[in-house]
Amino acid sequence: LCLDEFHQASPEEVDQSIYTLSNGVSKIRSNQDGSLASRKRWKLLFLSTGEIGLSEMLEKVQRSPKAGQSIRFLEIPVIGKYNAFDDIHGYASGKEFADAINDKIKNNHGSLIQPWVEHLSNIDDLPTYLITNIKELTNRWQFNSKGNQFGYALDRFALLAIAGEMATKIGLLPWDCGDSEKAIFNIVESWIAARGYESDSEDQFLLKQLPKALNKWRNK
């Protein structure tokens, strides 16, 4: 799910929506007769296509992202050789390349969904297949962190890499084997560099507050 024009939403709505989208279940509501309505459920990956991140959004109302929010809505810097791109495939500029992509999308979209779903449906025990491959890939990436939040994010990155590799192998993407994994790994490294640490946010908060606490109590 791509969230466009993210900056036009109110910070208060964004604050709550991050949990709503990621938790995958609607609020408990009642029918007109007072009985409980059935709860809607979903499972999705979502991203913002806007230029503003969650931290900047919440700063408008003097708030900071909670640990749960920051790990559900990852802030990934997009800085390429040509703005958002590293390769503009022969076009004169990043803007010209982006405009060409937008033009192609208008006439070519949805054509891969049927063969993709057919492929997934032919995999025996898809959940086990994904769990096994996600674990193998994250182990191969060899990050040292044991933090639960970092591991949660890494699993989501690995899922995207695996999906890309699967699509490449069955001819749905014109990439070479390993391209998807390499691209996602580069994104992981950018995310870690921008985040500044691999541990859980609460641990980092305590480390930042420790010098302040020591100075405070030393002067008592």
Regions found by a protein language model. Give the residues of each.
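Helix-rich terminal scaffold detector
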Residues: 35-37
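Extended alpha-helical interface modules used as scaffolds for assembling large macromolecular complexes
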Residues: 1, 9, 14-31, 45, ...
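Catalytic glutamate of the conserved HExxH
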Residues: 5
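Short loop/turn elements that form and flank the Walker-type P-loop nucleotide-binding site
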Residues: 40-43
